[in-house]
Amino acid sequence: MRTYDLSPFWRSTIGFDRLLNLVNDTVDNGDTYPPYDIERTSEDQYRISLALVGFTPDDVAITAERSTLTVEGRKTDEDERDYLYRGISVRPFRRVFNLADYVQVKDATFEDGLLKIALTREMPEALKPRQIAIDVAGNDHQRSDRTQAA
């Protein structure tokens, strides 16, 4: 049994605290199918990559609802093949990711057996930090005196 310490990532990622907790819980539960990566591509851009070899885009459904992203896959065997050995797993799966506040799904691409889901964090203007100008108290009174004289 492997133990992973993900605490260093908690300090360096913004907006994915709950998602990292989910990753930590997944490692503890032992459910690792399908394997996936979570990466930060820029300040407010993230990407989840799932290894889905053997699946096609038609076999996969992505649902985003509020702060939850669900990826489900079910391979439909259209042709009956006589496998001597079947090492490529195409079992049904369901992955649920809890997204942080203001994280939205931007798009999804499927290429070379990898499903890549782009996420972006769009903070509302009212919640972004802003610079506040500091006026000198004496200058404020002089300005009002000039206004009255004019």
Swiss-Prot record:
Keywords: Stress response
Residue ranges occupied by any sHSP domain in the UniProt entry: 27-137
GO CC annotation: cytoplasm
GN (gene name): hspE
Name the record gives this protein: Small heat shock protein HspE
UniProt cross-references to InterPro entries, sorted A to Z: A-crystallin/Hsp20_dom, ACD_IbpA/B, HSP20-like_chaperone
Top-level taxon in the UniProt lineage: Bacteria
SUPFAM superfamilies in alphabetical order: HSP20-like chaperones
Stretches that traverse the bilayer: none
Family, similarity comment: Belongs to the small heat shock protein (HSP20) family.
Source species: Bradyrhizobium diazoefficiens (strain JCM 10833 / BCRC 13528 / IAM 13628 / NBRC 14792 / USDA 110)
